[in-house]
């Protein structure tokens, strides 16, 4: 089971990035006191740790894939917030889109997890 993904991000982009992940179903959680400079978000036991870094590593061409509990509503919230949402070819008979989060990280939003379709 995946516990968390740590993402380096410029301090000026932390709030925007946290807002992006909140739009797709994550909620902020309190990090331990020793990591109070980080912003943590969680959804169904999986966490995203936004780690402030003055010179963040250039985002990789890879991506993070997230299953949205209410796919259509999550896509609408992203669009309403001004994010470009690019539909991708369907796999497993369910829709998916790609969006770029603040900081340049690619995030795939899926309507259903692959395991549910196998």
Language-model regions, residue ranges each:
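Short glycine-enriched loop/turn motifs at secondary-structure junctions
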Residues: 1, 56-61, 91
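N-terminal beta-strand motif that seeds the catalytic metal site of vicinal oxygen chelate
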Residues: 1-18, 62-64, 115-118
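Short hydrophobic/aromatic beta-strand micro-patches
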Residues: 8, 65-69, 100
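Core segments of cupin and vicinal oxygen chelate
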Residues: 8-47
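Structural preference for long, well-ordered alpha-helical segments within the folded cores
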Residues: 19-23, 77, 103
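Short hydrophobic/aromatic beta-strand element in the GNAT-like acyltransferase core
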Residues: 38, 47, 65, 96-98, ...
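Mid-chain, well-packed structural core segment of small domains
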Residues: 62-83, 89
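Vicinal oxygen chelate
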Residues: 81-118
């Amino acid at each position: 089971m995946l516990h968390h993904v740590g993402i380096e991000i410029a301090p000026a982009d932390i709030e925007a990035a946290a807002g992006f992940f909140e739009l797709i179903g994550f909620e902020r959680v309190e990090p331990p006191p020793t990591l109070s400079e980080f912003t943590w978000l969680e959804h169904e036991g999986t966490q995203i740790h936004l780690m402030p870094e003055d010179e963040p590593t250039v985002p990789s061409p890879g991506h993070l894939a997230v299953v949205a509990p209410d796919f259509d509503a999550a896509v609408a919230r992203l669009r309403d917030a001004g994010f470009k949402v690019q539909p991708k070819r369907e796999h497993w008979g369910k829709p998916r889109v790609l969006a770029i989060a603040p900081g340049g990280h690619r995030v795939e939003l899926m309507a259903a997890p692959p395991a549910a379709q196998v």
